[in-house]
Amino acid sequence: MRTIDLNCDFGESFGVYRLGQEEILSYVTSVNIACGFHAGDPLVMRRTVQLAIQHGVAIGAHPGFPDLFGFGRRAMAVSPEEVYAYVVYQIGALAAFVKAEGGVMTHVKPHGALYNMAAKDAALAEAIAKAVHDVDPMLVLYGLSGSELIRAGRACGLRTASEVFADRTYQADGSLTPRSDPRAIIADEDEAVTQVLMMIRDRRVRSVQGTDVAIEADTVCLHGDNEQAVRFAKRLYQALQNEGIAIQAPRREERR
């Protein structure tokens, strides 16, 4: 039976600023928790880990650039050495909360500009993969399907999960359409569900240029920061079940 993971970025509040709907945890199988650089703070991280454990969803670190004002979505001129340190630091911070709450960390997914840059920059991708491997080689590395990050993870022996997006359009080279392009976001729920089913069943996606692009889909990213997102997550969850597609998170590699 074909299986798919549904993941969402979570714990992206900071101080009195609140972002995210807890209800979405009923319809996802893994969460990527902000680690304090682009969003999140120690109290938010602890509470988010507790929520994830209560709902039985897989817990992952969501490291980003140190850019609270830009929410980690602004590109930064950084070296691979800096990226390595950023990722190790953030995984370590979240891992401490996960351990304190009696949970298990399963994966790592970079955030925002770091994710997008590592999709195309082999040196940054290798730095991220090495950081994950050095902290815990049993962690699963999430990255854009067909990206340098997925290649780097596989090259260093990590298990990887190729990620696709329900509400984003694609370019002919398999990259995401930049948010600056008015065609970047899929607002129509029917269109988004159709795209997800095509990516899972047919292993392809229709680009904005009109060409079909081959794609691997191990995990689908959903956004959980508004009421509409919760409704869509429920709808997609039901559509996958109706198609006989099992919904489950990738498992950590067993220690040998």
Swiss-Prot record:
GO MF terms held by the record: 5-oxoprolinase (ATP-hydrolyzing) activity; ATP binding
The reaction(s) this protein catalyses: 5-oxo-L-proline + ATP + 2 H2O = L-glutamate + ADP + phosphate + H(+)
First-level EC class: hydrolase
InterPro entries: Glyco_hydro/deAcase_b/a-brl, LamB/YcsF/PxpA-like
GO BP, sorted A to Z: carbohydrate metabolic process
Similarity field: Belongs to the LamB/PxpA family.
Role according to the record: Catalyzes the cleavage of 5-oxoproline to form L-glutamate coupled to the hydrolysis of ATP to ADP and inorganic phosphate.
Assembly notes: Forms a complex composed of PxpA, PxpB and PxpC.
Name of the protein this chain belongs to: 5-oxoprolinase subunit A
Origin species: Geobacillus kaustophilus (strain HTA426)
Gene designation per UniProt: pxpA
